[in-house]
């Protein structure tokens, strides 16, 4: 636990000789204080129970974030020698994740950042994206990422553009994403 990311359970299923990852998932899903579940996952030893837990998470709108290891052929062979686990075909696992709305991440930093998003009481809503930056470079970086992920920017309506134009420095365009360079102190 830290000030930025709190846990109500941190557990290692180890070789899953008595308690499986799916058992821990189910236990967390029965708790009222569970906002998200993050898994560092080598293999799925009980596919039926695992899928049932994914379905339960989806029904309760509990986000699942999974860092799956053993994705490469070499990594999968190491899983066998580490715990006797068969890592399985990663494309099949990805399809399972996509079907159940699971967020698959590639490293611990991405996992922590993703889980922090769900720690907040506010829920993200579907729709288009709007953003404001104090740096044109950051604006370009986020735009490149958004385009790569097929995320659409929202179009600003005329009244929003008019309001922004009254506060922006000359030369800055009232558009989404917005470059606030030098004007950020005029907005609350």
Q: What role is predicted for each listed range?
A:
Residues 1-188:
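Catalytic-core regions of core metabolic enzymes
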